Amino acid sequence: MVALSVVELLKEKIRQEGRVISDDVLKVDSFLNHQIDPVLMLKVGEEFARRFAGSAITKVLTVEASGIAVALMTGLSLKVPVVFAKKKQPSTMDGETYCGRVRSFTKEEVIDIVVAGSYLGPEDRVLIIDDFLASGEAARGLLKIITQAGATLVGVGTVIEKVFQTGGEALRDQGIRVESLVQIGSLAGGQIEFLN
């Protein structure tokens, strides 16, 4: 029996456990962003490490909370630290900070994300990792933080890209390398259309 690739494993998991909420929203909270399948997430992290091998990555960056599991497994596979942007600056975060503004598609709110200056710097080569890529808001907010830190963006890795929401296209048009494990072309009529 041939082992399925991580992409095929993800697609199968989405088919079995994913739920289309609307033409724009896919619910995958049973394995990705509420309850987490750690074995699958480790395979996802290993796949991102494979795809970005040779990029001299020094940090993996994500936004709390849904991206943390994927980012952690990617950092583990790359053997580099993981930094997550906080959605609220804690009172314990002092010194220089880097901030970005993000509009959450599913929560319909605008939030300011923040990273302590001591965790990102000009010497860093950063890989952004997240669970979903839709409008690209989270990636753009994290890119602002990377720019403020004087660090270098290596690329963006996302588990699921909703291609019909054009965030990935906009990032690619800026010359940013985007690696999406699963690309979805449509959720219309409650049907998941995979592009890869």
Curated annotation (Swiss-Prot):
Alphabetized InterPro entries for the sequence: PRibTrfase_dom (IPR000836), PRTase-like (IPR029057), Pur/Pyrimidine_PRTase (IPR050118), Xanthine_PRibTrfase (IPR010079)
Highest taxon, organism lineage: Bacteria
Biochemical pathway: Purine metabolism; XMP biosynthesis via salvage pathway; XMP from xanthine: step 1/1
GO cellular component, one term: cytoplasm
Enzyme class, broadest EC rank: transferase
GO biological process: purine ribonucleoside salvage; xanthine metabolic process; XMP salvage
Major location (coarse): cytoplasm
Keyword Cytoplasm: yes
Binding-site residues, 5-phospho-alpha-D-ribose 1-diphosphate: 134-138
Catalyzed reactions: XMP + diphosphate = xanthine + 5-phospho-alpha-D-ribose 1-diphosphate
UniProt entry tagged with the keyword Glycosyltransferase: yes
EC number: 2.4.2.22
Location of the protein in the cell: Cytoplasm
Gene Ontology molecular functions: xanthine phosphoribosyltransferase activity
Keyword terms of this UniProt record: Cytoplasm, Glycosyltransferase, Purine salvage, Transferase
Free-text function comment from the UniProt entry: Converts the preformed base xanthine, a product of nucleic acid breakdown, to xanthosine 5'-monophosphate (XMP), so it can be reused for RNA or DNA synthesis.
The family this protein is said to belong to: Belongs to the purine/pyrimidine phosphoribosyltransferase family. Xpt subfamily.
Protein name stated in the entry: Xanthine phosphoribosyltransferase
Gene designation per UniProt: xpt
